[in-house]
Each structure stands twice: as structure tokens, then as C-alpha cells.
Amino acid sequence: MTKARIDARFAELAREGRAAFVPYVMAGDPDRETALAILKGLPAAGADIIELGFPFSDPMAEGPPIQRAAGRALAKGMTLQGVLDLVRAFRAGDATTPLILMGYMNPLVTWGLEAFARDASDAGVDGLIIVDCPPEEADPLADALDAAGVSLIRLATPTTGDARLKVVVRRTSGFVYYVSVAGVTGVKEADAAAVAPNVERVRKASGLPVAVGFGIKTPERAAQVAQVADAVVVGSALVDEVAEAVDMNEDVTARVLSKVESLAKAVRLARRSHEAV
């Protein structure tokens, strides 16, 4: 399946006239068993696509919430092999929900790009977002992923000009991830009115659906962004729920999935203001 799952999901949602809800969770946070329970519960809670972070010791694009989540996962022994094992366990019960890995280049280089692409595809990964791989250096990774049938999903930002955007989207497939605010994750809030023209610009340049992430923390904000984007990504707000549940000795899985349900409902009820892709 791989790439086909992403395309099929966006086609399905376009027919429904709504955006996808994409929760981001960190693999292995707060531990492997809980992370797997959360992962398995996401589709029923309303996730249309899942973004699974793999922990890295120097997550430069992340704000404090996701940095701490990576630290918790690493402290519990989560590895890149462990991440693929989680994906396999998830796929044993779900063959249709697209799953994207998000992380950094160094662990992939250590693994070997071609080998990792094959292993990720075999595990059931549909796409990959690598935060610190610029387009000028992306061809070896893009070639490996293409051969394995896995999408390389690239990032565009508010400061990505038109000429640069052409370079960014050249090897992109699946969708484009639009970073709605400058800076690291979990700090500022997205402004749907400001996001809208850039989302349309990215959509026209790429011919692909556009997901908007960074700065979306509440159902209200998610609904606003869902009116102009093809997908809404929420990450820091969910990893915050993990941290707070751990601190308060609450049921982590139940708390996270409850938050997902409220966000997913808001996205599902929001009607998109542009024609479906």
C-alpha cells in the first residue's frame, strides 16, 4: 500500500469536503506499551492520518514539549528499530490509516538510506518528514524512498519564496507540510487568516494537498485552520497531555485520546472554504 494509503485518504476526504485531522505523537512516550496503546486508539478517536515522531537527542525544530517527549522516550530505551516495531504492531490491526514518520536525518544515515526506506515500507510506513534535510541534499533519500514506495513529505514555511518553493516541492509526494508559524513547535499560535494565502500558494505550486502544523493547540484553532487547509496537524498539545497525565498519575492513553477526539470533531465539523483538491 504505502503511498497509496495517503492518496486514497485525501481523495476520500476531498469527496467529503473536509480536512484531515493529523495527530502527532512521539514513539515510546512515556513508554513503549502506553505509546502503542495510544497509537492503536488514534483512528477510532478521529485520526485520519497519523504522524509518529521518532526520538532524537537534538531535535532542533522542536519546542520544549516535544523535546521533553523525545527525552522521555529515549530514557525508556526507544530506538529507531523500536519505532518500526511499533508501526508493525499498529499495522497488525489497521491496514488503512496512513502513518507518517517525522524526525531527523542522522539516525537514517546511520541505518543506511536504502535499507531504512525498505524496512520502513515493510513495517507499514507511508511517508517520511525529515526536518533537517534541505532539498539540495534530499535526492539520495528521495531516490531510496521512491524505490520503496514511501512518500517524502517536505516542509514549507511563511518565509519560503516562490522560487524556493519550486525547489522544495520538486521531490515531494503525498502532501506538503506547511509550517504556519516561524520558530520551533509549541510556542506561537497559528492565524488561519494569515495562513490561507500561503496554503493556496503552496497548493498551486505543488499540485498536492497541504497540511498545516505548528501553533494549533485548541479545537477552535483547529477548526479555523481546517477551513483553509487540506489537513490539520496537532502535536505539542498532545504531548503536553502525556506529560501532564504522567505528572498527575492519570491514565495517559485515555487523556490523550480524549483530547484527540475533541480536536478531530472540530476538524470534522469545519467545512473547507476552497474547492477540494
Curated annotation (Swiss-Prot):
Gene3D superfamilies reported for this sequence: Aldolase class I
SUPFAM superfamilies xref list: Ribulose-phoshate binding barrel (SSF51366)
Reaction(s) catalysed by this chain's protein: (1S,2R)-1-C-(indol-3-yl)glycerol 3-phosphate + L-serine = D-glyceraldehyde 3-phosphate + L-tryptophan + H2O
UniProt pathway: Amino-acid biosynthesis; L-tryptophan biosynthesis; L-tryptophan from chorismate: step 5/5
EC number: 4.2.1.20
Active site residues according to the UniProt entry: E51 (proton acceptor), E62 (proton acceptor)
Pfam families: Trp_syntA (PF00290)
UniProt entry keywords in alphabetical sequence: Amino-acid biosynthesis, Aromatic amino acid biosynthesis, Lyase, Tryptophan biosynthesis
GO MF assignments: tryptophan synthase activity
CDD domains: Tryptophan_synthase_alpha
GO cellular component: cytosol
Subunit-level organization: Tetramer of two alpha and two beta chains.
Family, per entry: Belongs to the TrpA family.
HAMAP family (UniProt xref): Trp_synth_alpha (MF_00131)
Annotated function: The alpha subunit is responsible for the aldol cleavage of indoleglycerol phosphate to indole and glyceraldehyde 3-phosphate.
Protein name: Tryptophan synthase alpha chain
Organism whose genome encodes this protein: Phenylobacterium zucineum (strain HLK1)
